[in-house]
Regions:
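Class I S-adenosyl-L-methionine-dependent methyltransferase catalytic core
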Residues: 1-196
Length: 196
């Protein structure tokens, strides 16, 4: 009798195209090419994130730093963000973000900025300030160990430029100590293997 191999659900989720889990675009899949540089946020972590954010997404400008698949920014659009800015340095992945925007019919509400977002503290691009920002910082987790100065400089530069009423969400793995973030009333929510 042949043995049936069981697929770990988390591995299957990581290998399949991310889907939007709430809002007006719920159930729609994103353009995706499995790549070791891209780690889409797990559905349950994204659901918890948007439970925390709540209505702050409505009318906000979502800024998805380290966008990868764009799952976070497109989720924000689906849940009422007025527009989304995706920051992605890998050009083929940036092209997939543009394809996702077209297939979802939201290309008029999306801007893709290609380049290294960690250079923004030195050369901050022009960003709209006519609505509060909803900033997502979900980098490769090792950046908090290998590039902590760059990560904190990015966070400081964005916080300084942000309009009043903006919200910041940082995702790291559970080994990250949220006390390393600049003091300002951060809430830490462990959702293993991540912490928001």
């Amino acid at each position: 009798m042949p043995k049936h191999s069981r697929t770990d659900p988390s591995q299957a989720e990581a290998a399949s195209a991310p889907r939007i889990i709430g809002g007006s675009l719920r159930g729609r899949r994103l353009e995706f090419s499995p790549d070791p540089r891209t780690r889409p946020m797990k559905d349950r972590v994204r659901e918890s994130l948007f439970d925390l954010v709540g209505t702050r997404a409505t009318g906000a400008i979502a800024i998805d730093c380290f966008a990868g698949s764009g799952a976070i920014g497109f989720e924000a659009l689906s849940r009422g963000a007025s527009r989304a800015i995706f920051c992605e340095r890998h050009f083929p992945t940036a092209d997939l973000l543009r394809k996702s925007a077209r297939s979802l019919g939201v290309e008029d509400r999306v801007e893709v900025k290609t380049g290294d977002v960690l250079l923004w503290p030195k050369r901050m691009p022009a960003l709209p300030t006519d609505a509060p920002w909803l900033v997502f910082i979900s980098p490769p987790w090792e950046f908090f160990q290998s590039r902590p100065g760059d990560m904190m400089a990015l966070l400081a530069a964005l916080r300084q430029a942000a309009p009043p009423g903006s919200t910041f969400v940082v995702e790291a793995d559970t080994s990250f100590d949220p006390a390393a973030l600049p003091p300002d009333g951060w809430e830490a929510r462990p959702i293993p293997p991540a912490v928001l």
